[in-house]
């Protein structure tokens, strides 16, 4: 609001003017010669007055002159509207007077269109905002001195122009904020309905099979007309390795994802009466353990009987279908001749028959006690049978014999001899092969001479090998032969030693075996990354080698922790070694290249890189002189911030973003927006200079750092950005206002 027209300042300035007018009027009223009718000579704009006994002509108010020959209009407005009428006015001169009018946006305090300030009337500001709807739909009116401005209300954005605006001169209008469709969350979905107006919220949830750590699941529509970036990160549920079950082993392949089923079978000697044992991966990322357990089986051996004089048969009552059971058969024999010693031996038998039977190599004319029980870990109540073998004709000797196997690689030869203590010679021919090694062959041949009636020969056989053993009785008219097959089990001792890694992905080890004997090795490799939960690499393969010191190089991914299980197929015992591969250069940035010549640089679009070769640590935007592009090394660490840059010839880091701060879709980075990105200032480009803008991706893990770079843009003869020009314009306007203020203050 302005001050009244008769403030102290203007009144002091009018005082000399009034004194001057008084002097002029006094001069016009001087008396004339005696006898002259002075009043008749007064000017038409003068008045005759009687003063001190004399008549004088005085110009009327608003005129100046001698009152008789001259009374001219006095232009009161020549001293300025502010001095005459007051602030926010325009002065209008009239014959013999003047009147004042308030400027647009102001009104006179006497509520008339014109006024004379001598009654105290002055101009006061009009509050245009009292008129509703002045700024149209969505607009908010703000009163100013002599005018008003329009701004958009909360929930609205200006369209077709900036704020503030004037509805009569500007095309700007206010439109309701509409954020549109909310952003998508990978592997997530929006819960319920939503609106897209200011302040609206949408809630996200992970789809089945995925979960998120406790984070904000809400995205809001902001005043910028965009949705907040969702912070929900859905990760696939992975329950890891299934739990161990007492007296059970895990069988088959299983999935660690939601709904994956791990299946177990009970160990030898145990069973699950309630059914199959399974464990299921739940939505909590944990395994739901089975309520069923493996209980010990107590095998009952019934109905033991003798047949063919030396063969024994029995029955079992196991509830399992086709149970493969190992038996221990203890034999104790006493010849009818009390002078002969007691003979004891043990025979092992493995079979899945419910009515097992075994033929024993027994002496004739001997009392035997046979004890049958199951081998550990299976338990049973032992069964016992006693019997006597029949006598034979000592003169009968046809050279026939039979063979029984015990302790896996030992043979017992039983021949009816004409004479106790007679010498016999046997020829052994042994040939071993492995089904999984086409070139493997173990052959040996030897003679064995003995005087024992039931000699025992233990063979030196390789594990996990199928052997054919042919035994021929020499020095016999009929040269009787017996052929048997032996399948040796895997070795119970370790056959691999001194395993070590070299060249990051290669292994070497020492094989404990006979020289030049081919062996097959089974590899099971499992790779994981702590920084990439969804990553899982599993490999299974085998190799064959006859070397005592085999070596193999593996096809491993960079930046990964591996567990390698190595087992020789001839052994049951694997060895496990851990390997860690170092990271390599991250994938090249996916950028859209720009070349700009004397124009503003468009916003650069940053896309998130995939963590293929190691964890992504950060993204950097580097601004270099164009001349340095050909010599720039991506691995260089010399680039500094803009303010610590020693010379214009050096490059600087304009922005640095941590990988976790880069959205999954993309984000835009305007070059030269005068903002800080991390610790780095994004400075405007210098006018008239040539620049090269580079995007650098950094991967860091295990104290190793790798980079990859891509040229984002080339800027030649750079001009000021729109943002810079706006800043300069506002700065210039501020200077003009300050100088004008100082000029008025000095008056």
Curated annotation (Swiss-Prot):
One of its GO terms (cellular component) is membrane. Residues 1-29 form the signal peptide. InterPro entries: EGF-like_Ca-bd_dom, EGF-like_dom, EGF-type_Asp/Asn_hydroxyl_site, EGF_Ca-bd_CS, Growth_fac_rcpt_cys_sf, NOTCH1_EGF-like, R-tyr_protein_phosphatases, Sushi/SCR/CCP_sf. Keywords: Calcium, Disulfide bond, EGF-like domain, Glycoprotein, Membrane, Repeat, Signal, Sushi, Transmembrane, Transmembrane helix. The chain crosses the membrane at residues 722-742. Residues 30-721 are extracellular. Glycans are attached at residues 87, 112, 193, 253, 348, 367, 563. It is a single-pass type I membrane protein. One of its GO terms (molecular function) is calcium ion binding. It comes from the Eukaryota. Residues 35-72, 73-112, 125-162 form the EGF-like domain. Disulfide bonds join 39-48, 42-57, 59-71, 77-91, 85-100, 129-141, 135-150, 179-221, 206-234, 239-281, 266-294. This is Sushi domain-containing protein 1.
């Amino acid at each position: 609001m302005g001050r009244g027209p008769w403030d102290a300042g203007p009144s002091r300035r009018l005082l000399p003017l009034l004194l001057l007018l008084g002097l002029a009027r006094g001069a016009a009223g001087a008396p004339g010669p005696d006898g002259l009718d002075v009043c008749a000579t007064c000017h038409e704009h003068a008045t005759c007055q009687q003063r001190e006994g004399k008549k004088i002509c005085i110009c009327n108010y608003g005129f100046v002159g001698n009152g008789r020959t001259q009374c001219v209009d006095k232009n009161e407005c020549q001293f300025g509207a502010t001095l005459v009428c007051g602030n926010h006015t325009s002065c209008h001169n009239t014959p013999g007077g003047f009147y004042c009018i308030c400027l647009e946006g102001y009104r006179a305090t006497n509520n008339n269109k014109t006024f004379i300030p001598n009654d105290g009337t002055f101009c006061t500001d009009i509050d245009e905002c009292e008129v509703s709807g002045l700024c149209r739909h969505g607009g908010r009116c703000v009163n100013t001195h002599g005018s008003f401005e329009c701004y958009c209300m909360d929930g609205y954005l200006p369209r077709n122009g900036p704020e503030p605006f004037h509805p009569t001169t500007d095309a700007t209008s206010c439109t309701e904020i509409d954020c549109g469709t909310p952003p998508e969350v990978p592997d997530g979905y929006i819960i319920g309905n939503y609106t897209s107006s200011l302040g609206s919220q949408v809630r996200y949830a992970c789809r089945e099979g995925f979960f998120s750590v406790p984070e904000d699941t809400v995205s809001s529509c902001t005043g910028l007309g965009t949705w907040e970036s969702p912070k929900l990160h859905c990760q696939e549920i992975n329950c890891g390795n299934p739990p161990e079950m007492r007296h059970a082993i895990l069988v088959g392949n299983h999935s660690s994802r939601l709904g994956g089923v791990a299946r177990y079978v009970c160990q030898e000697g145990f069973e699950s009466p309630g059914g199959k044992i399974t464990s299921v991966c739940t939505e909590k990322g944990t395994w739901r353990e089975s309520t069923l357990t493996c209980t010990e089986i107590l095998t009952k051996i019934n109905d033991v009987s003798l047949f063919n004089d030396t063969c024994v048969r029995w029955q079992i009552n196991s509830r399992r279908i086709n149970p493969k059971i190992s038996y221990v058969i203890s034999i104790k024999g006493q010849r009818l001749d009390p002078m002969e010693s007691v003979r004891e031996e043990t025979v092992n038998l493995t079979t899945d028959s419910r009515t097992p039977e075994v033929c024993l190599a027994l002496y004739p004319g001997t009392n035997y006690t046979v004890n049958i029980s199951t081998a550990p870990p299976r338990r049973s109540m032992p069964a016992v049978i006693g019997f006597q073998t029949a006598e034979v004709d000592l003169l009968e000797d046809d050279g026939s014999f039979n063979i029984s196997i015990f302790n896996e690689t030992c043979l017992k030869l039983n021949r009816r001899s004409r004479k106790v203590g007679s010498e016999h010679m046997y020829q052994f021919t042994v040939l071993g092969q492995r089904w999984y090694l086409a070139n493997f062959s173990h052959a040996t041949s030897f003679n064995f001479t003995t005087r024992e009636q039931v000699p025992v020969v233990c063979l030196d056989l390789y594990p996990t090998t199928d052997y054919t053993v042919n035994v021929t009785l020499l020095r016999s008219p009929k040269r009787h032969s017996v052929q048997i097959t032996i399948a040796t089990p895997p070795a119970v001792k370790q056959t691999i030693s001194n395993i070590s890694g070299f060249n990051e992905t290669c292994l070497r080890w020492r094989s404990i075996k006979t020289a030049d004997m081919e062996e097959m090795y089974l590899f099971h490799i499992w790779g994981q990354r702590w920084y990439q939960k969804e990553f899982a690499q599993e490999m299974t393969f085998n190799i064959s080698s006859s070397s005592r010191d085999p070596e193999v190089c593996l096809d491993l991914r960079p930046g990964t922790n591996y567990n390698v299980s190595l087992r020789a197929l001839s052994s049951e015992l694997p060895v496990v070694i851990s390997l860690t591969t170092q990271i390599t250069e991250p994938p090249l940035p996916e950028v859209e290249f720009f070349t700009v010549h004397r124009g503003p640089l468009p916003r650069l679009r940053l896309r998130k890189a995939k963590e293929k070769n190691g964890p992504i640590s950060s993204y950097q935007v580097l601004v270099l002189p164009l001349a340095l592009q050909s010599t720039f090394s991506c691995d260089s660490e010399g680039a500094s911030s803009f303010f610590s840059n020693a010379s214009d010839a050096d490059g600087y880091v304009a922005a640095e973003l941590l990988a976790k701060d880069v959205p999954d879709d993309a984000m835009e980075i305007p070059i030269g927006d005068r903002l800080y990105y991390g610790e780095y200032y994004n400075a405007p480009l210098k006018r008239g200079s040539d620049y090269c803008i580079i995007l650098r991706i950094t991967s860091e893990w295990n104290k190793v750092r790798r980079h990859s770079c891509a040229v984002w843009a080339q800027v030649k003869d750079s001009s000021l950005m729109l943002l810079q020009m706006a800043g300069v314009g506002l700065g210039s306007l501020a200077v003009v206002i300050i100088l004008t203020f100082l000029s008025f203050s000095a008056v």
